[in-house]
């Protein structure tokens, strides 16, 4: 496993079938993406456990009943396995607003979802600048160019559903 990647929580949620606003094709794409990641990539998370804590709020530790839950259990069980998981140190700059030194200081990103900033911080702190996988979170779509200007690559797993959702806003 040599390729690294970061997985936004919404990919696993959609894989579980808990996103009624998307089609079955998107759910299948998320399932396939998680399987590909498990078979051939190292997953990047933060050393302090913020990403795993977010997963824990939305996914089951038991690994059931969905494939997103199975991904979470696999990652949880392998978080210390350097061949599967790469833990990256990120630097919080305050306690309550989820701000990180690694997040770009850019007015174009001022309204970017604070709860997703940890993923960006991990991508920028990691030496390989791994891509972030997104299913249907429109922030990743709306801010894709601004993030790219700072070296953050977003892989849109469900581009058609995402465009449709973004057009509704």
Predicted features by range, described:
Residues 1-47:
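Short, well-structured N-terminal submotif of metal-dependent ribonuclease cores
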Residues 36-41, 49-99:
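PIN-domain endoribonuclease scaffold, especially VapC-family toxins
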């Amino acid at each position: 496993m040599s390729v690294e990647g970061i997985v936004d929580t919404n990919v696993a949620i959609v894989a579980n079938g808990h996103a009624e606003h998307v089609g079955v094709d998107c759910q299948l794409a998320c399932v396939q993406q998680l399987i590909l990641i498990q078979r051939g990539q190292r997953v990047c998370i933060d050393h302090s456990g913020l990403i795993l804590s977010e997963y824990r709020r939305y996914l089951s530790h038991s690994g059931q009943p969905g494939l997103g839950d199975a991904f979470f259990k696999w990652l949880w069980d392998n978080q210390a396995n350097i061949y599967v998981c790469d833990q990256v140190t990120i630097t919080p700059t305050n306690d309550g607003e989820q701000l990180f030194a690694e997040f770009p200081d850019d007015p174009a990103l001022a309204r970017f979802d604070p709860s997703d900033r940890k993923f960006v911080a991990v991508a920028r702190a990691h030496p390989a600048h791994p891509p972030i996988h997104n299913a249907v979170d429109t922030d990743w779509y709306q801010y894709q160019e601004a993030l790219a200007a700072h070296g953050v690559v977003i892989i849109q797993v469900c581009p058609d559903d995402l465009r449709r959702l973004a057009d509704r806003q």
